[in-house]
Amino acid sequence: MSDLSHIRNFSIIAHIDHGKSTLADRFIQMCGGLAAREMEAQVLDSMDLERERGITIKAHSVTLHYKAKDGKTYQLNFIDTPGHVDFTYEVSRSLAACEGALLVVDAGQGVEAQSVANCYTAIEQGLEVMPVLNKMDLPQADPDRVKDEIEKIIGIDATDAVACSAKSGMGVDEVLERLVQTIPAPTGDIEAPLQALIIDSWFDNYLGVVSLVRVRQGRVKKGDKILVKSTGKVHLVDSVGVFTPKHTATADLKAGEVGFIIASIKDIHGAPVGDTLTLSSTPEVEVLPGFKKIQPQVYAGLFPVSSDDFEDFRDALQKLTLNDSSLQYMPESSDALGFGFRCGFLGMLHMEIIQERLEREYDLDLITTAPSVIYELELKTGETITVDNPSKLPDVSSVADFREPIVTATILVPQEHLGNVITLCIEKRGVQRDMQFLGSQVQVRYDLPMNEVVLDFFDRLKSTSRGYASLDYHFDRYQSANLVKLDVLINGDKVDALALIVHRDNAAYKGRALTEKMKELIPRQMFDVAIQAAIGGQIIARTTVKALRKNVLAKCYGGDVSRKKKLLEKQKAGKKRMKQVGNVEIPQEAFLAVLRLDS
């Protein structure tokens, strides 16, 4: 289809659970993308993980052909986007390839935080945003209130928002009709030199690197020689095509279209996301503005359970980095866990997802240590160093000043939940900067220590405000703080992977909570296991996992007390000997116990 006016590129912005993947399924069904027998719920959420958690993690693309009421057939290139705060970079990448976006709002729940943030991203990138009210078949749907909220909070006209129910299929054709009319056609010149933006890439064991691209200018076909602008390397195109949602090869990809290019690139970093592709004959083509590089906020150590898996683990991380450009890693070794990698993530959900993807897709068994942020230390020698791993902290006596990262957090919350949110921020050592009332919502700005934000702040903010509060934060500065290193000792030995950096005021509480938690998680042994929390040389908390004991008196029917004493003494001596040589196996849950401390 050479006519650009018949192409529509759009993505769907929606909060978690407002039904965007179901709506996508309906689009595919109505446009005949899949036969009825191939249709299954959430076609686009192809990762098992996405289905189980009911969230979209990776952006997916589908090309559909829709015959509109005006008799013309339109090519719809639809890019699915994630809704969770940790994956906002995926959203910005998807939006860069579109001219418009559908803002899908649950007619029962109304506008929620994440869609507000993503919607602003879309408006900043100059996209046409079209509101859609979903779940109209539910008894609690209240379209008028929700339209009012869209106008007040996001500031776009929602008077004639399309109402539909993706589950029952009601009104979905109306959404497609409106979409064709509202969203502008792409601009671009098919005869100009090729200019294509890489939205996403992933590694296929047989095909090499597969890149999902949005062609801005020109065309690309099989047999062309393409140049990757950032690496300067030239590759021969093996095939181009689109997902319908099945992998379908086409003759070429033209300006305005979204599809995949396979050019047997074997080097994992051969086609980085956000890069520009052009033909080798026109190397002077301008580089398209890519995406800003995302800085990791949270660092954690990942270690293979068996040291033989280290090489496989490194290969898996390399392949995953191609698909997820925000993941960073460097080698690390630990006394307790052996060799592994220190990885940087965007947030806690991102960390869990990466770990699960490594375990499932690459069949690895991993142990994760507690996450930490980057601290700045000024030593007494006058030197300044940064530390992202508590076990690498220098001796306290050599540190002149300990600084922690502070973030400026902007929280949008309905007025009735404001009190709970303020209480939470104070508990997390926050300092209020300002407060503004916007209609029924309040915007508060707080300076919060980053290590308080990354652990469980987002989850607790959601639960304390019934899911209505939204959070946006960015790094501001380093600030001096009274921080200490909390060590965990098991049977008198320090376990480096369990060390934590905490504020001195919270240290005693954290130490007690952590030892109690560890007591539940460490399996009982044949001898007593002492779990202690210490700051420097001072023990601040202790619990004991009691030994399992066999009833050695079971065989004594009555009999003399000295006989029983002898058996008990013998057992005691055996336990003592065992304790000297016994090793305690620490399960994976214990390393993550730190996260579950509801401070």
From Swiss-Prot:
<keyword id="KW-0342">GTP-binding</keyword>
<dbReference type="InterPro" id="IPR035647">
    <property type="entry name" value="EFG_III/V"/>
</dbReference>
<dbReference type="GO" id="GO:0005525">
    <property type="term" value="F:GTP binding"/>
</dbReference>
<dbReference type="Pfam" id="PF03144">
    <property type="entry name" value="GTP_EFTU_D2"/>
</dbReference>
<keyword id="KW-0378">Hydrolase</keyword>
<keyword id="KW-0648">Protein biosynthesis</keyword>
<dbReference type="Pfam" id="PF06421">
    <property type="entry name" value="LepA_C"/>
</dbReference>
<keyword id="KW-0472">Membrane</keyword>
<dbReference type="GO" id="GO:0003746">
    <property type="term" value="F:translation elongation factor activity"/>
</dbReference>
<dbReference type="GO" id="GO:0005886">
    <property type="term" value="C:plasma membrane"/>
</dbReference>
<dbReference type="InterPro" id="IPR000795">
    <property type="entry name" value="T_Tr_GTP-bd_dom"/>
</dbReference>
<dbReference type="GO" id="GO:0043022">
    <property type="term" value="F:ribosome binding"/>
</dbReference>
<dbReference type="Pfam" id="PF00009">
    <property type="entry name" value="GTP_EFTU"/>
</dbReference>
<keyword id="KW-0997">Cell inner membrane</keyword>
<dbReference type="InterPro" id="IPR000640">
    <property type="entry name" value="EFG_V-like"/>
</dbReference>
<dbReference type="GO" id="GO:0045727">
    <property type="term" value="P:positive regulation of translation"/>
</dbReference>
<dbReference type="InterPro" id="IPR013842">
    <property type="entry name" value="LepA_CTD"/>
</dbReference>
<dbReference type="GO" id="GO:0003924">
    <property type="term" value="F:GTPase activity"/>
</dbReference>
<protein>
    <recommendedName>
        <fullName>Elongation factor 4</fullName>
        <ecNumber>3.6.5.n1</ecNumber>
    </recommendedName>
</protein>
<comment type="function">
    <text>Required for accurate and efficient protein synthesis under certain stress conditions. May act as a fidelity factor of the translation reaction, by catalyzing a one-codon backward translocation of tRNAs on improperly translocated ribosomes. Back-translocation proceeds from a post-translocation (POST) complex to a pre-translocation (PRE) complex, thus giving elongation factor G a second chance to translocate the tRNAs correctly. Binds to ribosomes in a GTP-dependent manner.</text>
</comment>
<feature type="binding site">
    <location>
        <begin position="134"/>
        <end position="137"/>
    </location>
    <ligand>
        <name>GTP</name>
    </ligand>
</feature>
<dbReference type="Pfam" id="PF00679">
    <property type="entry name" value="EFG_C"/>
</dbReference>
<feature type="binding site">
    <location>
        <begin position="17"/>
        <end position="22"/>
    </location>
    <ligand>
        <name>GTP</name>
    </ligand>
</feature>
<dbReference type="InterPro" id="IPR006297">
    <property type="entry name" value="EF-4"/>
</dbReference>
<dbReference type="InterPro" id="IPR004161">
    <property type="entry name" value="EFTu-like_2"/>
</dbReference>
<keyword id="KW-1003">Cell membrane</keyword>
<dbReference type="InterPro" id="IPR035654">
    <property type="entry name" value="LepA_IV"/>
</dbReference>
<keyword id="KW-0547">Nucleotide-binding</keyword>
<dbReference type="InterPro" id="IPR005225">
    <property type="entry name" value="Small_GTP-bd"/>
</dbReference>
<dbReference type="GO" id="GO:0097216">
    <property type="term" value="F:guanosine tetraphosphate binding"/>
</dbReference>
<dbReference type="InterPro" id="IPR038363">
    <property type="entry name" value="LepA_C_sf"/>
</dbReference>
<feature type="domain" description="tr-type G">
    <location>
        <begin position="5"/>
        <end position="187"/>
    </location>
</feature>
<comment type="similarity">
    <text>Belongs to the TRAFAC class translation factor GTPase superfamily. Classic translation factor GTPase family. LepA subfamily.</text>
</comment>
<dbReference type="InterPro" id="IPR027417">
    <property type="entry name" value="P-loop_NTPase"/>
</dbReference>
